[in-house]
Amino acid sequence: MRPLLQSGRRAGFTLIELIVVMGLMAMLFGIGVGMLTALNPGKRAALGLVQNMLRSARNNAVARSAPARVRLDPASGEIVAMGMDVLGTWQFETLGLDGSSGDDGVCTGGVLLDDGFLGKALSFEGAPAGSHAEVALQENPSFDLREGFMLQCALKLESPDGGRALDVGRAAGIECRSNGSLRAWFRPQVTSASGVASSGGIVAVDSEPGVWRAGYWMRVEVTYDRRILRLALDGVEVARAASAEPVWKIEAPLMIGDARAPFPGAIDALSIYAVVDSGKAVLPRAVSFAPDVPREIVFSADGSLDRELFSAPLSIGLEYEDGAKARVIVNVYGTVE
């Protein structure tokens, strides 16, 4: 007879082993929950969200050398970063007026100068009546200047008589006056008591007489951010005016020169920017803004807080559902902490 083999031990845990394993798992799980609670990713996410939106606006201000802003809505928890974005540039290397955005133009009577501000330039000096250039911007919906804009160009006049250099679809423009002054203007949108929007009278700024001379290139910049209309010549502000109105829509072509009286000079390096939403975000449901948060944070062209509005660092408070609080600090140089 063959001896009976003793059956092998079945695989598995004894009761004691099972209790020990469950105890270890419970201990590890408890430690993990504690660590996650301490980390609180929801709170960190809300804090990082606000910081990132502020940094995005500041970076835009520095990159474009133009003001940028962040709007905070305590009621909805919405954060909107707004800054300048280039809509189109024209370098006038050909009479086809090739635009960077595909918005090419038509030139009547103008000629190209080889010694422009940057490369070639478009000139109407000595051109016959009716000479001008135009680009049909009113057909491009992306050219929306409602929240603000920036116009940059180089001008060189050959006559002290001056003339109209630029008219952006009857919404904004630049003029050179015969007394040597510069004028920048825009047309605001006004809304009646019944809610009907229409074009208002122009808002304009004029420099002191004698800021420009015939025969020299000058760099002209006009900036409007629904707070200040600024006019700068060769990097120096020469005029400003306060306004908070939105800009009226572009409803006609961009006109370079004047069909009635040709511009007595040349233009080069034209760029048009508009204020656009560069980012939007909403705080998580369990987080809200503190009641004392500023509704708008404005960064200057150099990235610092606008010194006309803020003389000290800004504190933006966040309040959490569990009663905890946190703050984001923006110092006077625009650094977000």
Segments the model singles out, each with a brief description of its role:
Residues 87-114, 124, 168, 277:
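Short, tryptophan-glycine- and acidic/Ser/Thr-enriched carbohydrate-recognition patches
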Residues 216-230:
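Localized edge beta-strand/strand-to-loop motifs within extracellular or lumenal beta-rich domains
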Residues 241-266:
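Flexible glycan-contacting loops in extracellular carbohydrate-active proteins
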